[in-house]
Structures are given as C-alpha cells and as structure tokens.
Amino acid sequence: MSKSSPIEPVSASDVSQQFRDPGLYLNRELSQLDFNFRVLAQALDEQVPLLERLRFLCISCTNLDEFFEIRVATVRHAQEFGLPPAPDGMRPTVILNAVHDLTTKLVHDQYNCWNQVLCPALAALGVGVLSHNSWNARQKRWLRGYFRNEIMPVLSPLGLDPAHPFPKIFNKTLNIVVVLNGIDAFGRAGHLAIVRAPRSLPRIIELPQHLSRDGSQNFVFLSSVLSAFVGELFPGMVVRGAYQFRVTRNSELVVDEDEVENLALALRNELVTRGYRLAVRLEIAEDCPTPIVRTLLQNFGLQENAVYRINGPVNLSRVSQVYDMVLRPELKYPPFNPRTLRNSDHIFEIIAKGDVLLYHPYDAFTAVLDLLRQAAADPDVLAIKQTLYRTGKDSTIVDALIQAARSGKDVTVVVELRARFDEEANLGLADKLQEAGVQVVYGVVGYKTHAKMLLIVRREGRKLRRYVHLGTGNYHSGTARIYTDLSLMTANAAIGKDVHQLFLQLSGLAPKMKLECLLQSPFTLHAGVLFRIERETKFARKGRPARIVAKMNALNEPQVVRALYVASQAGVQIDLIVRGACTLRPGVQDISENIRVRSIVGRFLEHSRVYWFANNGTPELFCASADWLERNLLRRVEICFPILNPDLAKRIYSDVLQSYLDDNLNAWELGSDGVYRKLLPETDHAPYSAQVALLESL
C-alpha cells in the first residue's frame, strides 16, 4: 500500500441522497435463498460424482436450517419491534411471505432431487436408502427387533391430556405426533401423543449385509423405523396416523455484554436455553391432517407461513452420513495431493528470505501448522499471539499453543466465544488453554473478533523479529481442505508492527492507533474501501482506465453499494465475484451497467476475500477476513492486508481473480432482473473451471 495515499473517510451525504429507489437493491434474505438453489443445482449436475451430489443436497438443507435459525429469526425480530426496512424497501411481513414462497419451492426441489433423482441413482449402483414400503419380510423382522432392543428402551412417549401438556420440543429434533384411538390402562381416552427421538439415536441405520439379496449396501432412516413401529409404544390403542415433524428455533444468542461481568458465564447460561427459544419454522409430513398441523402451530406460536410440508425425512441433511459410510471412491471426487512448502523444517529461514503465499486447499495447510509447531519448540521464540474463531476438535494448533506455554513462552490467544454455533466448543477451548497457562482473552465487548492473525516474536542475535501469519480463513485443518482461502506468512517489519498493535488493542485497553499497512474494522477498513472506490471513480472521470475486481462471500453494505454505483456511472469497470448473498443489482442502465456480478459454486467452498484496484497503473491488491457486509465492516474486528510482493500479487490476480472471471462451468451470472443464470461455454470457448484448472496445476 502506498504511504502517500491517506485513508480518510469519504463523505457519503451526496451518495446517500442519490440511489434511494428500492428497486436498485436486492433483498438480502431472498438473495441468500438464491444461493441455496445454486448449491442444489450441483446435486442435479450429472457431471458431479454421485455421492458428492448427495453432499451438495445435504449442504443445501443445512444452509436452509441456519438461514431460518438466524436470518428468518432476525426478520421476525424486526417485525415484532417495527424496525425500518433495508434499502430494498421490503417490510418484514413482505419478506417473510416472500421467504415462504421461495422456500416452499426450494424444499419441493430438494425432496424431488432426493426422491426422484439421487435415491434411485444410488439404488442402481448398489446403495439403497429404503423407505418403509420397500422393506422385505426379513428386513422388516430385523428392524422390528432393532426397534425393540435399541430404540424403544430410550423412548418416552407423552400422551396429551390436562395432566400432560404439550412438551417442550428441542430445536431441530425428530419428533412423531401420533393419532390414537382407544382406552389406556387408566381408562383414559387417547387422542394425541408425542414421541421425541433422543439425539443419542442414530438417524441413519445400516442394515446387515445378509439381509440384501443382491449385495447392496442398505440404509434406513430412523424416522421410517419410528413411524413403522410406534404402535408398540401404545399397547391396546389403535394408531390412526403417525407423522414426523421438526421445529426450528431462533438460535442467535443474546447477551448484553455491557451488563454482564463474566461473558463466558453469561454465554454458558444462554447455551442452556438456546434450544427452546422462539420457533421460526415447522416441518411436517405432507400427509399430516390439517387439524393436527394447526394444533402444532398453536403450541409453537407460529403462523401458516411458517409451515413446510415435506415428502420424506424431516432432516434430509442426515443422509450425509451415507457419504461417510459408503466406501466407494469411484462415487466421490478423486483425491488430490496439495503442494507442500519446500524445506518447511526451517520455516523461519524461508519466511525471513521473503513473503510466502499459500492458496488453500491447493497449497497444504501443513505449512501453517509447521510454523506454529516450530515456534512452540524453538528456544529463540519468546512470545506467540493468535486469534481463534473456529478450529478443529483435535486441533494441532491448540496442542502447539499449549506446548509453547508449558515451555515457558508468553502465549496469548484471543478466543472468540461468540463464533456462531461454535460457542460451546470455544468455551471448552478457552478452558483448556487457560489450564495450560495460556493467557486467554475474549476480544472486545460488542465486537466479534473475526480477524485471522498469528504473531511470533523471535530473538535473532541482539534483535527481536516478528513473524506473522495472516489469513482469509480460520485456523482449522478440516475446512482448509474444502474451503478456498489465502494465507500470507511474512517477516515484514511494518506489517509485524501493525499486527502487534492490533493484539495490544484486543488484549489490553490500548487507544486507537494508526496502522501503516493494514486496514482494520471497525476503524479504517470501511473508509479505506470507500476511499479506493472513489479513487477509481476520479480516475475514470479524468478519462483514465479504472477498474475494480473484488471477491468475497457476500455484499450488502449500503454505502459500499452506492459507491460502486457512482463508480459505474463514471465508467469504472467493476467485476464482483460474490459467492452468496448480494444486494447490489448489476446491469441497470445509467446506474450499474459497468458492474458484473458472478457466483462460483464448485467442489470447494469459495471463502477467500480479495480486493483489487487498478490505481492508475499501480495496482493495489488486498486480502481480508472481511466481506463487504455491514457487520464485517462496522461491527467486527477484521483485518485487510496488502500483498506487497508484486509477484505474489500477480499470482493472486491470476489464480484467484482472473481465473474465476474466465470460469464458464461453475459460474452463475446475476442479471439486472435479480436472477442468477448458469453460464455455459460459448461455441468458440473451451469449457473451463477455475477450481479444476488449479487442481490440474498441482
């Protein structure tokens, strides 16, 4: 980054007055749902290996669960408190109705994909997921025994009457509502009962091989077994119907950090009640009678637009277990060996000679692990400071930090306790680190620490030298194999000083400090992005070539969107690679006709964030932990770091930006009508996938 380029906030008053038309903005929730359709399209793509298609189906289902737990819950909160609409102008009630309509189609497509496409295709290749009506006599006999021996002893059916009110139903659990006729042992007339399936029960049951006539590997859903034999829980009663259902609840933890003295304790208390918070969705078997559905809605406090009738198991994502249980390499993506860093046994010497760039998963994450392991064992290393947002359960990183602390090094770890759905794991991680003598801090009140930073202080001769790792993704060996992310390892003194100052802010009470190289949320990153967009705008107005290329997971920050519109009007050519939700509407005449938006959905989850600005012939390229979202730019601790080595910057531009702009196999283009369309190779262009090309380069 040029030191002569001051980072000053750009006045947005004129821009804010312009572009007030809600039609210029897409709705975030609907755009996020659109992404799930793109994921589901991978499950329908016959060029994708069959078990991988199954995984894509399950990912679309898991994404939808989280969408309701967080996004729909947020919209319902806005509806309850009368909050103002976003720039798209849609009121919460309108959003919820639109979400219901689009989700109904998505759910229909998901179950059609399973019932009509994937399940038959798997069966044809010897992998059967059997429904109740397809069991033969031997299979049914075995499953009845399994039910009596393994399932029935842990079930506690609850008949509904004045003494047995409707039970509390935990978030996203499998349940059966049973319609009964008859008189029980106490003379009570039965009508309805609820059977809850404990989480200890396997959701997918593999049948013994000897029960298969043709050598197939067969599985059965727990929900099918429960529905088939639930009558055995009610002897003497007649089962008129058994219908599976699942309720989804608001899972956003609410902790008033200004009012609590101990954040960890407050989060532990919140986690206890998270599974029983307000309901936001009811999934129910499609043949369930309407009166029963209304009873469930009443008990969960839901309206009709929260109901989704399904034709299959209520938690379709559970079928992902089949992927791991079926050992058929020919039905999965071929394995690959990522590049490894040469001479990584002497990693400090390598970094001291020059910056090291890694592009995961094509470059092995082991280099990052080697850096930390060698730092822990090196007697010349005096201190290690690191942020942890998400990490693996059996984390080599955590083990290295503990080893370093036990060997007498000063180790400080910023653990983000509020990492969504990893809160409990991170609480346990913090305890484990503290017990080993690591100084653990929880970041800054009111701001999630999402930055990915590692700082190592090493004595070399009479001086101390800082070694730094900065990344766009988490310190997580598992996701590093399936997410695309960038890592920079550097001994650059200015970057090291900036990172040191950031850790002072996070662990102490240091004032806001001016950084030489890095941009930081919530202080300078937002203004820095706006400054660079406006700089390209000024170049374009002077008739100079001006261009912006940016890659991220999502885009919705209003000031950034408006600044991009202004830049487009001035003639700046803008290419945005946005994997998920995007509220910017491209291709609008006289507004955004110079903006192109595409989304890449392929084998690996696109997770890297890269911003490139032409800068009048002296390009600037940044990598970041932040998307161009309001929360990332204004309400989180994030970092954005420049790639100062020209060769590394060119490599990123080629492999991470241009390659994805050339993709015509996994790319979806967003039109001015708000619709994503899958790109197809033109007749004079060869098919090209950026991810495949990068794999073939290994």
Swiss-Prot record:
Pfam families: PP_kinase (PF02503), PP_kinase_C (PF13090), PP_kinase_C_1 (PF17941), PP_kinase_N (PF13089). An intermediate of this reaction is the autophosphorylated ppk in which a phosphate is covalently linked to a histidine residue through a N-P bond. GO terms for cellular component: polyphosphate kinase complex. The active site is at 450 (phosphohistidine intermediate). It comes from the Bacteria. GO terms for biological process: polyphosphate biosynthetic process. Its EC number is 2.7.4.1. GO terms for molecular function: ATP binding; metal ion binding; polyphosphate kinase activity. Keywords: ATP-binding, Kinase, Magnesium, Metal-binding, Nucleotide-binding, Phosphoprotein, Transferase. Mg(2+) binds at residues 390, 420. It catalyses: [phosphate](n) + ATP = [phosphate](n+1) + ADP. Catalyzes the reversible transfer of the terminal phosphate of ATP to form a long-chain polyphosphate (polyP). NCBIfam families: poly_P_kin, PRK05443.1-1, PRK05443.1-2, PRK05443.2-2. This is Polyphosphate kinase. It comes from Xylella fastidiosa (strain 9a5c).
